[in-house]
Amino acid sequence: IIARAVAANVGAVITAGVTVEDSRKAIEAARAHERVFAGVGVHPTDLAGPLTDGDTADLDQLAGVPEVVVMSEIGIDHQDRSPDRQWQNQAFQAQTEIARKHGLPLVFHIREQGDDYDAHSARDAALSLLREASAGDLGGTAHYFQGRWKHASQFLDLGFHISFAKTLLRIPDLEETARKTPADRILLETDAYPQPFKKNRDKWTEPRDIPGVAAKLAAVRGVGIDEIRRLTTENALSMLGSKATVVRALVEPDRIE
């Protein structure tokens, strides 16, 4: 995966944790590969109950590791079979506090029931929690964004970035959001989670797919792809804040995921 990313001119990859144990594996991957950096966190759909004191202590310890550059992946998920919403709110709050302690930007997941682009319960819950924690000053991004412009603008108003993935290639409603998002707030990603539902392993989403998203974004915004490469690299480094130092030393100006 890393070799294919390098061949596609992706300069660096952030691999996210979705459980405490998975976060440890993300750190191991970052230590093993110089182009890989880690995020730590518990994903809302991986909750089996409220975060325990042990969970938060473990995440606190992991968040202080030098290879960790973001609190990820945390969030709110309101699908029918998602875990209890109170558990999710508690986990989101606890992980935001850990992020603040360690100066980590937030990479957060928001998913509505039935992937309804006009639904808003998950978004409203996330916005409320972010405002309550004054989390905008931490920086971060609404990751794998799939909402309408009116929804994106609410996260932008708090100071967050908007991250576009391969869904931009297949969801026309996202194009308005991609056009209107300020140039200094756009990020690119692939959200390369395991995809066993795809029978052909070669079709799994990977960091190597970033150039395709960049090309689509360039077409939607009416600019050249070199401009998209430049601004999204600058934006990623800006989003990382103080954690950008270790990435900046590696990444060339036109390459980053």
Across the structure, where does each feature detected by a protein language model lie?
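Mid-domain alpha/beta scaffold segments of enzyme catalytic cores
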Residues: I1-E257
